[in-house]
C-alpha cells in the first residue's frame, strides 16, 4: 500500500515538472526552448550523404510507420523550408549530438554517424508526441545538447530456455535502438538448448538444439525431477550461420554491437548431450528439461575439451565482429571435477590449489586463445573466484557489491545486478493478486517494479577513484518463464526505459519527469504493437 501511494503521489505531481522537459527517453543532458515552431511533412527533406544516408533511411521508414508520412532523403535541401540536415563534427564526442530545431529547419550534428542516429531517435520521439494535422507535424523550436554517461548500454536476451524467431530478435533490437542502447548481449547456449550452428560440430544443433519436453511452472535446482510436471512437447530450434549474419547486420545498421555468449564451463548440458566425451563421466546426457543448475559441466582435465571450445569459438569469431566475446563462467558446480581423476591430475600438474583455481585455469586458457585472435572476454562475476586477469571485463549480477569488488581489483565492470536489472523478475509484490504471469525473482519475493529499476545507481557509493572502471549497465531477460515473444516484451517494457535512463542520463535523472515522458513513449509502444506491462500506468507497483 505504501508503494502504491508513493506511485500515486509521483503521478499526481507530474504537472509540476519543469516546462523545459521534452518527451524524450532517455532524458537529454540539456534542453533550451526558444520561441517559434516549424512544421514538417511528407515534403520535408532529410539532407544526408555518405555514411549518414543509412541512419537517414532508417529514420524515414520509422517516421512513415509511426506518423503516416515519409520524409524525402536527398543530398541537398533545395528550396525546402523544413529540411532536416544531418552532419558530423569531430569536435563532439563519438556518441554526442546537438539537435537544433528552428523556424528555418532542423539540424542534427553528431560526433559520428552513430551520434546522429541517436539525435534522430530523439527527433523521432518529438515528432510522435507533437500535434498532428493530417500528415503535418508542428514542432516547438529548441536546442538539445546530449550525450550518454556510460559507454556500454546493453540488453541481454536468452534464446535458449525458449527460442524466438529471427524477426522477433530483430524486434528486440528495434526496442533497444528506440532506447539508445548500443549493445545486444545474445545468450546462445544453455543446458536447455544450443542455439547457434557450428559446422565443425553438427551434433550441437542436430542433438543439442532440441529438448524432449519442458517442465511446467516453477522448478528449482533441488527439486526431484521425477516428481515435476512436464508438458510432453519437444522444444527447440537454432539460428543458422546465415541467420546470425543477418541479425548482426541488422543490429549494426542500428549502431548496436552484438556480443555472443557461449557459456562455459557450466551451463553446457546441451553440448554434453551432443558430444558426451566432453563430460567428466562420458555420458549419457540429455538436453536438460527443467530449470536450475546442473552438476554436469565440461571436463577441465581433458585436452579434447579445449579443442572443442576453440573450434566453436573459431566459427563464432567469424560471425561476430564484436570486440568482446562473453564466455559465461557462472554457476559452475565443482562436484564432477572433484570426482574426476583427469581434473584432479590437472590440478596437480598446474600447481593449482583447488577446483576454484581450476575454473580460473579454464577461463585463462580461453581468454588467452581469444586474445591471440584479437578479442577480449566478458564473464559473469563468478570468474573472479580463484583469480582472474585484469583484462577480463566482469559482468556483475550477484549484487552491485560484486562489481565494486571487481573494480577494486582493477577490472572493468558492467553493472547488471539482479536486484535492479533482472527484467524477468515479477513487477509487483503480489503477482497473484495482479494476475502476473509466472515470473522470476522467487515468484514475487524479489519483485522489481519500475521505480526500483529507475533508482539504481551503478556507482553504488563506490569511491570516485573507481568510477572509471564502471563501464556501463545492462538489463537482462532470462526466458525460463517466457514461452513467447509477447511475454518477453511484457517483461522488458516499460522497465527497459528505466534501464536506458540509468545508463544514459546518470546524474541527470528525475523520476517525476520520467513518469511524464514515459506516458508519451507508451504511445510509441502502442503504435509499434509492442506488448508491455501496464502496472505503472495503473498506479500499481
Where are these regions (language model features)?
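Flexible, acidic glycine-rich loops studded with aromatic residues
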Residues: 376-382, 387-392, 398-541
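Bacterial Sec-dependent N-terminal signal peptides
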Residues: 1-23
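Soluble non-cytosolic domains of exported or imported proteins
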Residues: 50-57, 113-117, 163-167, 238-242, ...
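Contiguous, structured surface segment used for ligand recognition
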Residues: 20-150, 487, 503-537
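Feature activates predominantly on carbohydrate-active enzymes
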Residues: 92-296, 300-306, 311-324, 365, ...
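Flexible loop/turn segments at secondary-structure boundaries
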Residues: 54-55, 163-165, 191-197, 265-271, ...
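Active-site neighborhood of glycoside hydrolase catalytic domains
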Residues: 271-277, 281, 286-393, 397-410
Amino acid at each position: 500500500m505504501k508503494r502504491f501511494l508513493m506511485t500515486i503521489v509521483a503521478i499526481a505531481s507530474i504537472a509540476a515538472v519543469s516546462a523545459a522537459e521534452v518527451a524524450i527517453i532517455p532524458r537529454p543532458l540539456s534542453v533550451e526552448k526558444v520561441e517559434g515552431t516549424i512544421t514538417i511533412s511528407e515534403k520535408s527533406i532529410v539532407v544526408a550523404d555518405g555514411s549518414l544516408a543509412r541512419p537517414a533511411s532508417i529514420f524515414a521508414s520509422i517516421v512513415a510507420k509511426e506518423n503516416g508520412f515519409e520524409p524525402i532523403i536527398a543530398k541537398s535541401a533545395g528550396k525546402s523550408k523544413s529540411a532536416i540536415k544531418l552532419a558530423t563534427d569531430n569536435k563532439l564526442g563519438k556518441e554526442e549530438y546537438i539537435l537544433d530545431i528552428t523556424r528555418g529547419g532542423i539540424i542534427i550534428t553528431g560526433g559520428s554517424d552513430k551520434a546522429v542516429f541517436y539525435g534522430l531517435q530523439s527527433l523521432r520521439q518529438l515528432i510522435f508526441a507533437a500535434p498532428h494535422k493530417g500528415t503535418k507535424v508542428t514542432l516547438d523550436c529548441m536546442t538539445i545538447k546530449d550525450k550518454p554517461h556510460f559507454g556500454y548500454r546493453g540488453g541481454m536476451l536468452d534464446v535458449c530456455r525458449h527460442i524466438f524467431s529471427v524477426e522477433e530478435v530483430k524486434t528486440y533490437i528495434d526496442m533497444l535502438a528506440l532506447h539508445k542502447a548500443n549493445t545486444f548481449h545474445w545468450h546462445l547456449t544453455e543446458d536447455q538448448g544450443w542455439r547457434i550452428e557450428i559446422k565443425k560440430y553438427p551434433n550441437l544443433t542436430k542433438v543439442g538444439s532440441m529438448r524432449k519436453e519442458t517442465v511446467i511452472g516453477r522448478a528449482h535446482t533441488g527439486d526431484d525431477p521425477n516428481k515435476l510436471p512436464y508438458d510432453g512437447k519437444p522444444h527447440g530450434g537454432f539460428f543458422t550461420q546465415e541467420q546470425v549474419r543477418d541479425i548482426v547486420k541488422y543490429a549494426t545498421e542500428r549502431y548496436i554491437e552484438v556480443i555472443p555468449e557461449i557459456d562455459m564451463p557450466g551451463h553446457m548440458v546441451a553440448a554434453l548431450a551432443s558430444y558426451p566425451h566432453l563430460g567428466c563421466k562420458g555420458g549419457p546426457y540429455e538436453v536438460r528439461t527443467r530449470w536450475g543448475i546442473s552438476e554436469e559441466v565440461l571436463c577441465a582435465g581433458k585436452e579434447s575439451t579445449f579443442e572443442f571450445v576453440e573450434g566453436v569459438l573459431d566459427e563464432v569469431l567469424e560471425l561476430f565482429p564484436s570486440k568482446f566475446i562473453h564466455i559465461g563462467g557462472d554457476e559452475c558446480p565443482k562436484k564432477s571435477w572433484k570426482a574426476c581423476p583427469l581434473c584432479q591430475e590437472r590440478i596437480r600438474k598446474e600447481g593449482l590449489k583447488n577446483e576454484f583455481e581450476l575454473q580460473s585455469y579454464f577461463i585463462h586458457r580461453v581468454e588467452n586463445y581469444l586474445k591471440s585472435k584479437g578479442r577480449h572476454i566478458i564473464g559473469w562475476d563468478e570468474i573472479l573466484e580463484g583469480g582472474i586477469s585484469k583484462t577480463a571485463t566482469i559482468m556483475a549480477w550477484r549484487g552491485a557489491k560484486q562489481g565494486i569488488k571487481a573494480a577494486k581489483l582493477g577490472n572493468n565492470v558492467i553493472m547488471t545486478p539482479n536486484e535492479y536489472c533482472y527484467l524477468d523478475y515479477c513487477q509487483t509484490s503480489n503477482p497473484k493478486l495482479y494476475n502476473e504471469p509466472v515470473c522470476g525473482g522467487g515468484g514475487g519475493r524479489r519483485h522489481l517494479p519500475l521505480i526500483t529499476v529507475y533508482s539504481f545507481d551503478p556507482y553504488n557509493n563506490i569511491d570516485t577513484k573507481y568510477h572509471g572502471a564502471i563501464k556501463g549497465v545492462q538489463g537482462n531477460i532470462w526466458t525460463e518463464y517466457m514461452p513467447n515473444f509477447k511475454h518477453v516484451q511484457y517483461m522488458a517494457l516499460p522497465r527497459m526505459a528505466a534501464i536506458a535512463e540509468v545508463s544514459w542520463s546518470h546524474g541527470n535523472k528525475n523520476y517525476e519527469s520520467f513518469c511524464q515522458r514515459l506516458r508519451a513513449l507508451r504511445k510509441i509502444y502502442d503504435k509499434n504493437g509492442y506488448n508491455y506491462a501496464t502496472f505503472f500506468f495503473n498506479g500499481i507497483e
